[in-house]
Amino acid sequence: MAKGGDVRVKITLECTSCTRDSVDKKYPGVSRYITQKNRRNTPIRSELKKFCPYCYKHTIHGEIKK
């Protein structure tokens, strides 16, 4: 049986270019992905390159607070 709290936590990744740019786009909004990370292996905030449907390109998605 597992001891203590959960090691794997759910995190939300948000597009960094959508939050910075307020350029008039076809669809206004912010791209977000939900994933998991192991708190022991990666204690720092994670950043992944994912596709943003609002920017129409692959951008850096950073972890945000809940």
Curated annotation (Swiss-Prot):
SUPFAM superfamilies: Zn-binding ribosomal proteins (SSF57829)
GO molecular function: structural constituent of ribosome
Keywords: Chloroplast, Plastid, Ribonucleoprotein, Ribosomal protein
Localization of this protein: Plastid, Chloroplast
Alphabetized InterPro entries for the sequence: Ribosomal_bL33, Ribosomal_bL33_sf, Ribosomal_zn-bd
Gene Ontology cellular component list: chloroplast; ribonucleoprotein complex; ribosome
GO biological process assignments: translation
Family designation: Belongs to the bacterial ribosomal protein bL33 family.
Protein name, UniProt field: Large ribosomal subunit protein bL33c
Organism name: Cycas taitungensis
Gene that encodes it: rpl33
